[in-house]
Amino acid sequence: MNFTTLAKERYSCRKISSRPIESEKLEAIKQAAIAAPTAHNFQPVKVWLIQSPEALEKIKSVTQQKFLHTSPACFIVGSNAGQGWVREEDSMNFADVDASIVATHIMLSIQDEGLATTWIGNFSPEK
């Protein structure tokens, strides 16, 4: 599939299958995350692949998204501002931008593997 088609076909899916994801597909997705660029190659991003039922239950408990309850896996992308590149002119820290780039690589790779995603930003940080 070419990139333009991939980008156009990717959407936020609300009907998540509980079917396990093949390890080859997960490896390809991980490689796409690793290949994502970061500002000045500082790499302030960390990615967690959550698959255990116990860990998935914890993830589900902090979000209001009911469709997530059938998901067999979840990628969590975070950044460490202390490790991000900071632009001198205005002190903008690029750690969150870098995390967004990595997350986008993950989502597009998932789509390329014939799977579906949704971006979840609505969660309880306190939990």
Language model regions located:
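Acidic, surface-exposed loops and disordered segments
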Residues: 1-127
